[in-house]
């Protein structure tokens, strides 16, 4: 008599071909590269429209509880403070060019 030492195949392994055939017969909806880019662009446009202005984002005054009970006081006020300088803030105007990655930099 033969004895097998391997693990018996799982249900999914036994039905692999059947599952593949069922998948392709179902005619799944696929999106081409051009359509994918169009969908992504329209999503980005919606996100840009939805982004609040700094005033809407960071200058909030409300009654207690309206901001998820962030404070036990009667008013919650958050304001953004700017000094007109971007020094040390991690922001840039896009003029920074990173150095080219070379073997010398890696060593």
Curated annotation (Swiss-Prot):
It is found in: Nucleus; Cytoplasm, Perinuclear region. It comes from the Eukaryota. Phosphorylated with a circadian rhythmicity, probably by the double-time protein (dbt). Phosphorylation could be implicated in the stability of per monomer and in the formation of heterodimer per-tim. The keyword Cytoplasm applies. GO terms for cellular component: nucleus; perinuclear region of cytoplasm. Keywords: Biological rhythms, Cytoplasm, Nucleus, Phosphoprotein, Repeat. Residues 82-95 have a biased composition (Low complexity). Essential for biological clock functions. Determines the period length of circadian and ultradian rhythms; an increase in PER dosage leads to shortened circadian rhythms and a decrease leads to lengthened circadian rhythms. Essential for the circadian rhythmicity of locomotor activity, eclosion behavior, and for the rhythmic component of the male courtship song that originates in the thoracic nervous system. The biological cycle depends on the rhythmic formation and nuclear localization of the TIM-PER complex. Light induces the degradation of TIM, which promotes elimination of PER. Forms a heterodimer with timeless (TIM); the complex then translocates into the nucleus. This is Period circadian protein.
């Amino acid at each position: 008599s033969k004895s097998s030492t391997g693990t018996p195949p799982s249900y999914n392994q036994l039905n692999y071909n059947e599952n593949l055939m069922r998948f392709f017969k179902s005619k799944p909806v696929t999106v081409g590269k051009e359509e994918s880019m169009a969908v992504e662009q329209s999503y980005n446009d919606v996100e840009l429209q939805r982004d609040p202005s700094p005033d809407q984002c960071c200058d909030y005054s409300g009654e207690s509880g309206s901001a998820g009970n962030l404070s036990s006081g009667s008013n919650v006020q958050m304001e953004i403070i700017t000094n007109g300088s971007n020094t040390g803030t991690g922001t840039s105007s896009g003029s920074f060019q990173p150095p080219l990655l070379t073997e010398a930099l890696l060593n």
